[in-house]
C-alpha cells in the first residue's frame, strides 16, 4: 500500500494549534489545489471531543469560507481528521499560512457568537448523519482554547520522518 503524505511527518514534533501545508498539486486544468492540516491539538496528547468537533464541522466550514474565500481562493472542503486532532482543508489556490491562520482565528471568534444550538447549520436528521451528537458548549470551549493559544505554522521539512525511521516502522 502506498504511504500517504500525512504519514511521512513526525506527529510527535507537531505544534498545535498550527497550520501546515499538507499537499499542493495541480488539477488537470492547471488550477493549484492546496490541502492544509489545521491541527487543533497535539497528536497523541489531546483530542477534540466528538460532540465538539462535530459541531465545529458544521460551523467552521461556513465561517472559514467567509474569511478566506476570495478572487484567488475557493475552499472545496473542510473535514475533521479521523484522529480528532484537527481538520483537513482542501482549496483551490495557494494562500499563505498566515492568511489561513488569520481566517481560522476569525472563525473561532465567529463560533463564540453563536447564541444557541438552534443556530447550528444543517442540524437536522435530513442534513446530518448524527444530528443528535452536537455540543455548542464544547465547540465554543475549543474555540476559546484556540484563541487563547494562538496559531503557529508547522513546516514539513522540520517534521519529515527520516527514511531510517520509516523503514523501521
Curated annotation (Swiss-Prot):
Residues the entry annotates as binding Fe cation: 54, 58, 128
Keywords for this protein: Autoinducer synthesis, Iron, Lyase, Metal-binding, Quorum sensing
Catalytic activity: S-(5-deoxy-D-ribos-5-yl)-L-homocysteine = (S)-4,5-dihydroxypentane-2,3-dione + L-homocysteine
EC nos: 4.4.1.21
Cofactor(s) annotated in UniProt: Fe cation
Enzyme class: lyase
GO biological process: quorum sensing
Family per similarity comment: Belongs to the LuxS family.
Biological role stated in the UniProt entry: Involved in the synthesis of autoinducer 2 (AI-2) which is secreted by bacteria and is used to communicate both the cell density and the metabolic potential of the environment. The regulation of gene expression in response to changes in cell density is called quorum sensing. Catalyzes the transformation of S-ribosylhomocysteine (RHC) to homocysteine (HC) and 4,5-dihydroxy-2,3-pentadione (DPD).
Name the record gives this protein: S-ribosylhomocysteine lyase
Lineage, top ranks: Bacteria, Pseudomonadati, Pseudomonadota, Gammaproteobacteria, Alteromonadales
Amino acid at each position: 500500500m502506498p504511504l500517504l503524505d500525512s504519514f511521512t511527518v513526525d506527529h510527535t514534533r507537531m505544534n498545535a494549534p498550527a497550520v501546515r501545508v499538507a499537499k499542493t498539486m495541480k488539477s488537470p486544468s492547471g488550477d493549484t489545489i492546496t490541502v492544509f492540516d489545521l491541527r487543533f491539538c497535539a497528536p497523541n496528547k489531546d483530542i477534540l471531543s466528538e460532540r465538539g468537533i462535530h459541531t465545529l464541522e458544521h460551523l467552521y466550514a461556513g465561517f472559514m469560507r467567509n474569511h478566506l474565500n476570495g478572487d484567488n481562493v475557493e475552499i472545496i472542503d473542510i473535514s475533521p481528521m479521523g484522529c480528532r486532532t484537527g481538520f483537513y482543508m482542501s482549496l483551490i489556490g495557494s494562500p499563505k499560512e498566515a492568511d489561513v491562520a488569520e481566517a481560522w482565528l476569525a472563525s473561532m471568534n465567529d463560533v463564540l457568537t453563536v447564541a444557541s444550538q438552534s443556530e447550528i447549520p444543517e442540524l437536522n436528521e435530513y442534513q446530518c448523519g448524527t444530528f443528535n451528537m452536537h455540543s455548542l458548549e464544547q465547540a465554543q470551549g475549543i474555540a476559546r482554547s484556540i484563541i487563547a493559544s494562538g496559531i503557529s505554522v508547522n513546516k514539513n521539512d522540520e517534521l519529515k520522518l527520516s527514511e531510517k525511521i520509516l523503514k523501521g516502522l
